[in-house]
Amino acid sequence: MGHALCVCSRGTVIIDNKRYLFIQKLGEGGFSYVDLVEGLHDGHFYALKRILCHEQQDREEAQREADMHRLFNHPNILRLVAYCLRERGAKHEAWLLLPFFKRGTLWNEIERLKDKGNFLTEDQILWLLLGICRGLEAIHAKGYAHRDLKPTNILLGDEGQPVLMDLGSMNQACIHVEGSRQALTLQDWAAQRCTISYRAPELFSVQSHCVIDERTDVWSLGCVLYAMMFGEGPYDMVFQKGDSVALAVQNQLSIPQSPRHSSALRQLLNSMMTVDPHQRPHIPLLLSQLEALQPPAPGQHTTQI
């Protein structure tokens, strides 16, 4: 584990014997803050995620998030630059130093286009989808599931390549639920950690004897694909109106007709949004179908976003 030292008077912090200059705040969540910092040793920008740890469990979860990052060396999964635990009296902060992506998230891109009355092209969608699937394939191959895939958790690199972030909700891919108590525990966990409008149907009402597997990510991927196609998630408006998302996801999704999209893309989306998880495809099958559609290679002008 690295060591952190705050040098507040100079607006710098030291992590693993390297000094970083605070530039500005990037955002904040319930118990975390993200700052833009510059490495004074290399001139590169980084995102410093600071997680407030009130209890031992918080520290363990932050450590686990760092461990999840360290499992992967993959172009479509966010890498961890450094991790440390900072202590100030009874207060603890877990610091995750991450690469900074100036283009922001996939959601930022969807919103930017929507503001101009535009959408991602099908070629762009296919290329992005391929990268997201490859990231998920790597996660699933290690025996884990992401569990909180959504457009705001997908960064865009300099060439527009998708990079999966926020690994704090990751857990084992295959969960054998045996009994009502375990089912309720998992359901409560999902309510806290899996964004409601991207949450798979099987996580809203967990059965007392069932298997929850990595295909919860495939449902979420379908919601991401829908957002890329139509500028909003399939259940965003349901949630915003205050209607029941849990009820809405129990019915097969009706996909709007659009001349922008091929029947093959619509069929792909339809398969991801299969309510019965046992009938939902795994990522390797989706990858083979995507590769058969032959999206343009990275760097070709049609894929640039």
UniProtKB/Swiss-Prot annotation:
Q: Does the keyword Cytoplasm apply?
A: yes
Residues forming the Protein kinase domain are 20-293
Topology of this chain in the membrane: Lipid-anchor
* S-palmitoyl cysteine-type lipidated residues: C6, C8
Q: What mutagenesis or variant effect is reported for C8S?
A: Loss of palmitoylation
Q: Which residues carry this modification: Phosphoserine?
A: S197
Q: What InterPro entries would the database entry show? A: Kinase-like_dom_sf (IPR011009), Prot_kinase_dom (IPR000719), Ser/Thr-specific_kinases (IPR052239), Ser/Thr_kinase_AS (IPR008271)
Q: Does the keyword Nucleotide-binding apply?
A: yes
Q: Where in the cell is it found?
A: Cytoplasm, Perinuclear region; Membrane
Family statement drawn from the similarity comment of this UniProt entry: Belongs to the protein kinase superfamily. Ser/Thr protein kinase family.
Task: Share what the entry says about its subunit structure, partners included.
Answer: Monomer. Interacts with DRG1 (via its N-terminal); the interaction phosphorylates DRG1.
Function noted in UniProt: Membrane-associated protein kinase that phosphorylates on serine and threonine residues. In vitro substrates include DRG1, ENO1 and EIF4EBP1. Also autophosphorylates. May be involved in secretory vesicle trafficking or intracellular signaling. May have a role in regulating stromal-epithelial interactions that occur during ductal morphogenesis in the mammary gland. May be involved in TGF-beta signaling. Able to autophosphorylate on Tyr residue; it is however unclear whether it has tyrosine-protein kinase toward other proteins.
Name of this chain's protein: Serine/threonine-protein kinase 16
